[in-house]
Amino acid sequence: MTPRLVAIDRPGGPEFVDDVLRIWDAGDAVFPVDQRLPAEAKSAQLRTMRVGEAVEEGDALVMATSGSTGTPKGVVLTHDAVTASAEATSARLGVTHEDHWLACLPLSHVGGLSVVTRALHTHTRLTVLPGFETTAVDESGATLVSLVATTLRRIHPERFRTIVLGGGRPPADRPPNTVTTYGMTETGSGVVYDGVPLDGVEIDVAADGEIRLRGPMLLRCYRDGSSPVDADGWLATGDLGRWLDDGRLHVDGRRGDMIVT
């Protein structure tokens, strides 16, 4: 039977995770619908992503870019890419079976859904909330959480072993247990942690300052069949950066329409 793209249109929670596993077990790919969209916008997004239509064998996810500087694109991530991202991230963070992931960011964005896929691939305890709520986050008992700067300011950070921080420039006074990430939907979440690439990730800074990335967690293609990855496997991010004296990557700014997550 030809695999197809199946939408999950429900808030985060145990049922969402059950849906992901059920769809994958059937050989299909998952498209998580943004719960913040009104009904008309949801319908338009489902059409754009061609929900219900065929996908390739091995495709796991289609994730929508935010479209903040252009029309949202459907990023196709394979099971191999999702696994590579989960394994590299878990290795960098030193995740063990004693850890407990908390997902509280929108699951329609790769920064939120990647928490779920990491936990599933590493068999780590997982709590999925329908959204960010300060008390629920603080009292979750989780050891690992992915946040953005605006949510970081609203919690007690010392309650977590490690906080994975994405979504833009980190605050100057960030807690010592935070790890800053750089990545995008097309890279299946963060691929550079505190300026250092994850295992298997290559970085090239071109003469004009544009950051290029290569690694096993990159997208297969966009939903329309086009691909931003060149013949040698490099993804031009549209972001500008430079190498610091200590060998870490510093991201200076953005150009183009790819979205930092």
Please place each PLM-identified region on the residue numbering.
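Conserved AMP-binding A3 loop
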Residues: 59-87
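Gly/Ser/Thr-rich phosphate-binding loop
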Residues: 144-147, 151-197, 202-204
